[in-house]
Curated annotation (Swiss-Prot):
Its main location: cytoplasm. Homodimer. It is found in: Cytoplasm. The active site is at residue 37. Beta-alanine binds at residue 61. One of its GO terms (molecular function) is ATP binding. This is Pantothenate synthetase. ATP binds at residues 30-37, 147-150, 176, 184-187. Keywords: ATP-binding, Cytoplasm, Ligase, Nucleotide-binding, Pantothenate biosynthesis. HAMAP family: PanC.
Amino acid sequence: MQIITSPEELQRLCLDWRCGGVKTALVPTMGYYHAGHESLMAYARERADKVVVSLFVNPAQFAPGEDLAAYPRDLSGDAEVAQRAGADVLFTPQPEAMYPQGFDTWVEIPGLSSGLCGADRPGHFRGVCTVVMKLMLLTLPRLAVFGEKDWQQLAVLRRMAKDMHLPVTIDGCPIVRETDGLAMSSRNVYLTPEERRQAPALYQGLIRARDMVAGGERDTAVLRAAVKEYWKQHLPEGREDYLEIVHPDTLQPLERVGGMATCAAAVRLGRARLIDNLALI
């Protein structure tokens, strides 16, 4: 596995691959790998000739006061994981290489970015879309792989690829969970023992909504109220950022569950901001 820090060097390599008919897969990450990241790399490895994993804690997607400086990092450990997973390249640029002095070009998807996480984190998806567009232009992938835990991010990036006619397929991989149901996340290390004990209730609340739909309930206000009541009892230290039932593609809130519907939520628990989602049908 090559470790590359220069955008220009990466682009030259990937352009040679593309001209030679090589199928490249891109796995964008911010590092501090867990089994969820490994599942993305394994998915890419099975479907491409070459796999590029990017490891970049992207400052453009952090708002002032967020955890950019505190975000967990372990470059040597992550390199071992990426190599073991079969990555051909680990791309680890410095911020000044991706955003040199005078950088002033941004990619925004206003509609899909406005609700859910976008409402609470202004500018977040502008940073995500911009860095992913740059990574795609550097690597020229046929396939890009993301986790479904960040469902809104997946929907936004698919819209970007469609609107810009990018010759890339964007695939989502299922959420990888701890044995108690908590979605794996690099930020879970922020949780205290007591917060970690409560954290699985986020997912259990979503399961309650799914079970109610299976039992015939269709009113999303009733479903959301039931989830909030469950959290009140089992996640008392959590502070809800949002809880919505939306169409999985448009992310528009639904009044009734009549077809495809996803329950998406974000809860702050101590220093951690936990997100999760679950298809209700």
